[in-house]
């Protein structure tokens, strides 16, 4: 991958209901009335001014791509019933996409279709496996692709769909591997048929949820873009590709001929971006590395403003250290 064509991206949240379903506080009292990013909200939490200021800062850091986590944060024509109070209209989002593109940013949509991150779907989250559910998914993906003027990619999530990841939810839904693969292939086909490449989270846990290494390697379309996410320390020591779970996953995807955008964060280790970019630039086949993503996991709110700026800046620093400034 030529340096000039690489993706240097950040995940920003428009909607916020990708984690806690309604009544989660009945299972985990800590979430009740708790000022946390991962509670269910029936109103918009995204601060428009913070959104604008953060996105305007990105080019200064060398960030060239924004992944917009939409969820229930926009009023869709096909399913206005899922939108929360204060959700952006399509015209508002369309105008903001134009503004960001004028800044030189590529704008990529994201909606998470994992059963473990489906609070934004409202009642459709509990209809998995039905024709109503499949029509809902098709409608949402198709309308968003049109809204974003056929983007290069559509991030579909699809991670953390197991019982342990949903242990604090009021209702946990886990698809059998064959069903999860079938449903994912359906989503992929909706994207590909409309000229957009699918993009998913791909750690070993997700690979196992799809049926394990062989099923994933043999059935996963090569059009799909992958993001292994790892937020801890990666020591550049002898044998790191065998001892560190993320490094192993980066190499595994490369060996399988899959393109990837390794994902870092300031969530738990402030130098994680440097670690991830160093390991991948040094050890992983450059033809597999499409770019990198910063996922701060901080909502777009005034209380998180400086955290978001710092996250973007740290990825920019890592980019300059290992790929140069230009």
What are these regions (language model features)?
Residues 11-225:
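Aromatic-lined carbohydrate-binding surfaces of glycoside hydrolases
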Residues 256-326:
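Substrate-binding cleft of secreted/luminal carbohydrate-active enzymes
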Residues 90, 243-244:
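Active-site-adjacent beta->alpha loops and helix N-cap segments on the catalytic face
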Residues 1-9:
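N-terminal amphipathic alpha-helix/helix-capping segment at the start of soluble metabolic enzymes
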Residues 125, 199-242, 249, 269-284:
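Substrate-binding cleft/loops of secretory-pathway carbohydrate-active enzymes
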Residues 195-197, 219-225, 254-260, 286-289:
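Glycine-enriched alpha-helix->loop->beta-strand junction motifs that scaffold or abut catalytic
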Residues 117, 151, 155, 164-168, ...:
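Charged, low-complexity C-terminal accessory regions
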Residues 12-15, 202-204, 229-231, 264-267, ...:
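Structural motif
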